[in-house]
């Protein structure tokens, strides 16, 4: 087993619940990697934390183009720490949303979503639930590839479904059954999270932002309408339902108001992902086949997905002026991809205008 001294630390990427991630360079090969330093708490003195053991075990067993690859495990310089060495991708989707300050194009969202669904379909077919799907765990490379990361909370499941700890998924992406204390859950919890991610990509901010579990479930009820036993049999028997006081009598689904401009087909997929009853929630396999992906605009090809400048940790804290410079860079980059088409359209517009001075002004739309 190699030592972390085999790598040169380049930059700090971020810190999660179960590890600190840095950008590094392999001194032998020159390859750029991501180094995840595993947090070892007081209870872990005698070994590697269970979350890290699960992550290592699962990542060694799976291989998919839309799942981040674990390259190796190395020991710390003093021998009492371990580092997980991953392939490096330049961005995570949450940082892109925060720094671009504008929603992605629908064709780009379709490309993102398809790649995510394929990764999750693969996991579920291998009896694995990720349990922590969120935009910050979706890595994006400037080659257009999206890869699912952070398997610290992932675990295998079986049939019949056994009891599993419900408080795993990050609050804003947590499904109603988990918020209400359901312990016998399965792959549907990941699909709710994907619905939350889909909504976030559409509106450019997290979809439902509760302050705690009770606030989160109340916000869900306000957005999607209060559930009942007819649409979600058994929900009122879940452990945490009795903790809810003053449930708003709000029978209407208001989700459409958040995304008024998307097509009915797009809204149908979003609605099926954010379905109360987990047994009726759409699966990853069925979502991939949804008509949303077969209507205009079609999913952007990976090769034509936009490239973004590297967002360092310090960059994320820069002032508004610098952030606007970043936005201009992105907009110029995306504009240049279709520059010739835009020029041709503008030329045609000018020709038509000059041919007939009595015509109404011809408005050019990008």
From Swiss-Prot:
Induction: Up-regulated by Pseudomonas aeruginosa, PA14 strain infection but not by Pseudomonas aeruginosa, PA01 strain. The active site is at 132 (proton acceptor). SUPFAM superfamilies: Protein kinase-like (PK-like). The keyword ATP-binding applies. GO terms for biological process: protein phosphorylation; regulation of cell cycle. Residues 7-293 form the Protein kinase domain. Its EC number is 2.7.11.22. It is an enzyme of class 2 (transferase). It catalyses: L-seryl-[protein] + ATP = O-phospho-L-seryl-[protein] + ADP + H(+); L-threonyl-[protein] + ATP = O-phospho-L-threonyl-[protein] + ADP + H(+). InterPro entries: CDK, Kinase-like_dom_sf, Prot_kinase_dom, Protein_kinase_ATP_BS, Ser/Thr_kinase_AS. Residues 315-366 are annotated as: Disordered. Keywords: ATP-binding, Kinase, Nucleotide-binding, Serine/threonine-protein kinase, Transferase. One of its GO terms (molecular function) is protein serine/threonine kinase activity. Residues 315-358 have a biased composition (Low complexity). ATP binds at residues 13-21, 36. Belongs to the protein kinase superfamily. CMGC Ser/Thr protein kinase family. CDC2/CDKX subfamily. PANTHER family: CELL DIVISION PROTEIN KINASE, CYCLIN-DEPENDENT KINASE 11A-RELATED. This is Probable cyclin-dependent kinase 10. It comes from Dictyostelium discoideum.
């Amino acid at each position: 087993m190699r030592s972390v001294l085999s790598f040169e630390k380049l930059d700090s990427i971020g810190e999660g619940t179960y590890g600190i991630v840095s950008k590094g360079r392999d001194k032998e090969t020159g390859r750029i990697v991501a180094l995840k330093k595993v947090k070892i708490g007081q209870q872990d003195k005698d070994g590697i934390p269970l979350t890290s053991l699960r992550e290592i075990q699962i990542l060694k067993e799976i291989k998919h183009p839309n799942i981040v690859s674990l390259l190796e495990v190395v020991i710390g310089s003093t021998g009492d720490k371990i580092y997980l060495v991953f392939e490096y991708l330049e961005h995570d989707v949450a940082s892109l949303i925060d720094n671009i300050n504008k929603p992605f194009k629908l064709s780009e969202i379709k490309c993102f979503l398809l790649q995510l669904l394929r990764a999750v379909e693969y996991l579920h077919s291998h009896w694995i639930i990720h349990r922590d799907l969120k935009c910050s765990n979706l890595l994006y490379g400037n080659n257009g590839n999206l890869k699912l990361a952070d398997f610290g909370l992932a675990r295998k499941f079986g049939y019949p479904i056994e009891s599993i700890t419900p408080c795993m998924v990050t609050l804003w992406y947590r499904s109603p059954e988990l918020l209400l204390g359901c312990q016998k859950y399965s792959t549907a919890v990941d699909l709710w999270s994907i619905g939350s991610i889909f909504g976030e990509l559409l509106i450019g901010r997290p979809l439902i932002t509760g302050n705690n579990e009770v606030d989160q479930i109340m916000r869900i009820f306000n957005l999607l309408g209060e559930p009942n036993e007819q649409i979600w049999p058994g929900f009122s028997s879940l452990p945490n339902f009795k903790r809810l006081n003053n449930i708003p009598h709000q029978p209407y689904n208001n989700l459409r108001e958040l995304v008024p401009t998307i097509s009915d087909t797009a809204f149908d997929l979003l609605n099926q992902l954010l379905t109360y009853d987990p047994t009726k929630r759409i699966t990853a396999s069925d979502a991939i086949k949804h008509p949303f992906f077969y209507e205009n605009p079609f999913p952007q090809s990976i090769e034509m997905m936009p490239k973004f400048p590297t967002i360092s940790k310090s960059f994320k804290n820069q002032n508004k002026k610098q952030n606007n410079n970043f936005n201009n860079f992105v907009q110029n980059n995306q504009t240049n991809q279709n520059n010739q088409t835009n020029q041709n359209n503008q030329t045609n517009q000018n020709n038509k205008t000059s041919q007939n001075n009595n015509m109404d002004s011809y408005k050019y739309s990008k």
